[in-house]
Amino acid sequence: MARKKIREYDSKRLVKEHFKRLSGQELPIRSVQINQETDLNELVEREPWLSSEKLVVKPDMLFGKRGKSGLVALNLDFADVATFVKERLGKEVEMSGCKGPITTFIVEPFVPHNEEFYLNIVSDRLGCSISFSECGGIDIEENWDKVKTITIPTGASLTFEICAPLVATLPLEIKGELEDFIQVIFTLFEDLDFTFLEMNPFTLVDGKPYPLDMRGELDDTAAFKNFKKWGDIEFPMPFGRVMSSTESFIHGLDEKTSASLKFTVLNPKGRIWTMVAGGGASVIYADTVGDLGYASELGNYAEYSGAPKEDEVLQYARVVIDCATANPDGKSRALVIGGGIANFTDVAATFNGIIRALKEKEAKLKAARMHIFVRRGGPNYQKGLAKMRSLGDEIGVPIEVYGPEATMTGICKEAIQYITAAA
């Protein structure tokens, strides 16, 4: 399971669309998104309610506590909304220690209300927990003792008997309505492969539940079976995180291939860099460097898998090596080319792309005092490792090569020993 945050706009879009599909009832949610590309005149023509109703506007940037931070404006007309957005669009703010520009806003009808409820559903490996409170809103944390929680084991259904403790203290006139609402939202949560869904608050309009503020996360590994249900979904970068040009390039490669190519710069000045085959293995290598006390020296996270073509590996390896060798400072560096034991991927074939990139970057590798550590197993691995061994002599760069007889992460310790001994 990979939990990916989505914007509030998309959370509400999914809930609105699929609440009706699953229950036959309409949730009167209306919202629009505004960013740098939005033509406000066209937006009003497409959504005429924007010019006839009082509105709410707030950033839609994956961070919370917007109300307490003065970033929510209420009871505005559209001209005021446009001014609010213009004054803040692209401006940098700091939230919970993270700084970044505000690029996206959500605009909705202003709904006067007296009641504020809280609903939260979270999934984990054992099932789901559902939390509910009659005291929702911005002070939910101060009223956490009033939150009731139930647990639904994996594979179990949410029956009215199980749900009963959540709504036990509600007035009779709204108890049934909210119980039905929680039932449908939980069904929707599972049907769409949400991993997290929070409404804080939701209220009642004409006796019917109406979500005012919403946060959602989806299991993006379920995208293959939900592409029609999710529609044009966006998984934004976390607030404060902006892709570098190199990361954007690899992301573009990844989008165009059936293989997997991932690359994230963690510390541009780090002295340990990785290029690891396999999603699970890549995490293990990164964790091992951290567990050995050298997380601060880890330059990147990198993973390739799914039998990428040689040219794709070549382009990928060029980027990793360019970042790993940038701005040589006389200190030694290590490049870990690791992986587990492949089942189907031809190790020699994927190594061909890496070897070509290493040859191209010979001068950069030497200038950065790079030492390369290789560990791999799988189909045709002997041929691939032999090529790596001969490459070291050919380009004059030290390369330590190991097969499946060595522990998978042993080269992490060797890399650390190298950079510390040479310090």
UniProtKB/Swiss-Prot annotation:
Gene3D superfamilies: 3.30.470.110, Succinyl-CoA synthetase domains. GO terms for molecular function: ATP binding; ATP citrate synthase activity. Keywords: Acyltransferase, ATP-binding, Cytoplasm, Lipid biosynthesis, Lipid metabolism, Nucleotide-binding, Transferase. Citrate binds at N343, T345, R376. GO terms for cellular component: ATP-dependent citrate lyase complex; cytosol. Its main location: cytoplasm. Its EC number is 2.3.3.8. It is found in: Cytoplasm, Cytosol. It catalyses: oxaloacetate + acetyl-CoA + ADP + phosphate = citrate + ATP + CoA. One of its GO terms (biological process) is lipid metabolic process. Heterooctamer of 4 alpha and 4 beta chains. Belongs to the succinate/malate CoA ligase beta subunit family. ATP citrate-lyase is the primary enzyme responsible for the synthesis of cytosolic acetyl-CoA, used for the elongation of fatty acids and biosynthesis of isoprenoids, flavonoids and malonated derivatives. May supply substrate to the cytosolic acetyl-CoA carboxylase, which generates the malonyl-CoA used for the synthesis of a multitude of compounds, including very long chain fatty acids and flavonoids. Required for normal growth and development and elongation of C18 fatty acids to C20 to C24 fatty acids in seeds. This is ATP-citrate synthase alpha chain protein 2. It comes from Arabidopsis thaliana. The gene is ACLA-2.
